[in-house]
Amino acid sequence: MIEADRLIQPQIQAQDESIDRAMRPKMLDEYTGQDDTRAQLKVFIQAAKNRNEALDHMLIYGPPGLGKTTLAMIVANEMGVNIKSTSGPVLEKAGDLAALLTNLESGDVLFIDEIHRLSPVVEEILYPAMEDYQLDIMIGEGPAARSIKLDLPPFTLVGATTRAGALTSPLRARFGIPLRLEFYNIKDLSTIVTRSAQVMELDIDAEGAFEIARRSRGTPRIANRLLRRVRDYAQVKHDGAVTKFVAEHALDLLDVDSEGFDYMDRKLLLAIIDKFMGGPVGLDNLAAAIGEERETIEDVLEPFLIQQGFIQRTPRGRIATVRAYQHFELIKPE
């Protein structure tokens, strides 16, 4: 199984985009969860509107699937301006960024996803644009080349990244508003599932929404994806309504257990428990034992398991925690 095949992967899949767009909240009052972030944004947005200024540049960071793109769109809606969206890997040349910047109107939002992947040459162009609303570009080539400055309208750059530490210090320092998104609690995810079901005109009760939410790994994108699959099951196997019974059976059929684990998660945990007596075990040995690349374990499988307290990283290797043993109804040896 590869990451792109996993139902519970947080990265966006092709089928998510159009459906997620319909489910996205448009304004801050419709946005569920991230209470501290919402409270801060309300103040910053109102202050900028009162002064009739562009909002400060904003960096939104955190794990994938938590709503960074949605939040950028909400900022534009709240400010009553347009938003232009792109991503770091797409901006290969300075001219690519210059074309976007020169088409912005006063107050507009420029959203750059995966901003940590900007090339150095593009990043250099961004510095004066962010600080002074100026664009330094080279005209011509060789000895005849000359630099000209173009004035830009005040704008707001919203950068999104899953790896804030990968940003260069000069770029990170130019964001006046850093916002970290955290994994969602089950209550907030239940609210999101219920709202999405309403958009889909799907009958769901509170227990059904809760069951989907608690298996969604704290991630709205996964919750919405699971909801769509549970809807299929409810319409084919039952009367179309989603109850706790229907959600449990649908998600069990999809091999997503009570903790939101799939086959790959359980395979990793059981390898540590059964093959290495609970650990510690080195990454290379673990990769060989389950037939996966070490990068897949480190970047895809481990983060959620560590965050939830099922695995510990130690200097000697990976260790399965008491909670991991309890999940499989096993007793951890002393």
UniProtKB/Swiss-Prot annotation:
Residue segments, region Head domain (RuvB-H): 258-334
Keyword DNA damage in annotation: yes
Catalytic reaction equation(s): ATP + H2O = ADP + phosphate + H(+)
Region (Large ATPase domain (RuvB-L)) residue spans: 4-184
Major site of localization recorded for this protein: cytoplasm
EC number(s) recorded for this UniProt protein: 3.6.4.-
SUPFAM superfamilies: P-loop containing nucleoside triphosphate hydrolases, Winged helix' DNA-binding domain
Listed SMART domains: AAA
List of residues binding Mg(2+): 69
Sequence positions that bind ATP: 24, 65, 68-70, 131-133, 174, 184, 221
Pfam families referenced in this protein's UniProt entry, alphabetically: AAA_lid_4, RuvB_C, RuvB_N
NCBIfam families, per database record: PRK00080.1, ruvB
HAMAP family noted in UniProt: DNA_HJ_migration_RuvB
PANTHER family xrefs: HOLLIDAY JUNCTION BRANCH MIGRATION COMPLEX SUBUNIT RUVB (PTHR42848:SF1), PTHR42848
Family indicated by similarity: Belongs to the RuvB family.
Protein name stated in the entry: Holliday junction branch migration complex subunit RuvB
Organism listed in the record: Shewanella baltica (strain OS185)
